[in-house]
Amino acid sequence: MRKIILTGDRPTGRLHVGHYVGSLRERVELQNSGAFDDIYIMIADAQALTDNADNPEKVRRNVREVALDYLAVGIDPAKSCIFIQSMVPELTELTMYYMNLVTVSRLQRNPTVKAEIQQKNFEASIPAGFLCYPVSQASDITAFKATHVPTGEDQEPMLEQTREIVRKFNDIYGEVLVEPDIVLSTNKACLRLPGTDGKAKMSKSIGNCIYLADSPKDIETKIMSMFTDPTHLRRDDPGHVEGNPVFTYLDAFSTDEHFAAFCPEYSCLQEMKDHYTRGGLGDVKVKRFLNNVMQETLRPIRERREYWEAHLEDVQDILKAGCEKAENTAAKTLSEVRRAMRINYFEDGNLLK
């Protein structure tokens, strides 16, 4: 079986470091590994409209921002197909067919959907499109017969819902669709990076993010104001590293080379953690080290973004070519689905016979 990746992001804002360690960094590594036959990376504008229907300009504007972020982190259009969801109409048709294979109660039980409904205050009035977006995700994944989906752990319920739809479709109509596997980062700190305010999740809407496109000054300001251990009031106080966002970020980003370059009194992160835990290490010093780490990590990303911002016509050409390739692939899958469902009425000329 061909090994195929499908992944993507909603264009509701610029991408942040949570996206980077949660999936973007992994995507670049997978892209460059040569282990996959095809890689599709989707800008999910149609999905973004499920809770931004009254603000389409926001979605339109951020299609550009997400495309620039993809290219900035190292997504290579020669190796990965970057496309816009709404420019592949076959996905909408597949969604309609799949909606007959899932119940409303099952959609309401999806933990990811339940959490997002609460976060967006949709309890009293849930847009139908928002409730059904797991079905749309199933269409996105199966249209390209994706075998692997790199994403965050909070999306596992979505992948399981896709697998359920695939199994039900194949059971009724025959073996057409492929069940996908999730690809998670091996670094546990990367699975869900907390916000700079200590909240469990970094969120564009809450504003507790460090963006990939942030200036050096903005990065420094956000890091130096980060939440830490509230019981660590003085430098000599014993501190806690568990649940401390500064150390969670260091888990996700720092390397021994960073210590050699910026904090040579420690050979590795564990030595710094041990010192902080027993007392004698202040938060300011730890934050300054984290700032050096983040500046070095984000500098090349920001420089590549500036290059592509100066070549927007090339970015548009990349997106157009990606959409054409994605539509051709999705059309083939849709044809197989119609044939399996016996709704390919004029394909063989036997409709009325």
Where are these regions (language model features)?
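Pocket-edge structural micro-motifs
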Residues: 7-9, 84, 145, 195, ...
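Conserved nucleotide- and phosphate/pyrophosphate-binding catalytic cores
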Residues: 157, 163-353
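Structured ligand/cofactor/substrate-binding pocket environments in proteins
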Residues: 15-24, 40, 55-62, 78, ...
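Active-site-proximal beta-alpha loop/turn segments in soluble metabolic enzymes
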Residues: 49-52, 143-147, 201-202
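N-terminal Rossmann-like or analogous alpha/beta NTP/dinucleotide-binding catalytic cores
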Residues: 2-139, 257, 296-298, 305-306
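N-terminal amphipathic alpha-helix/helix-capping segment at the start of soluble metabolic enzymes
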Residues: 1-2, 328
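Residue-level "edge-of-site" marker
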Residues: 83, 149, 351
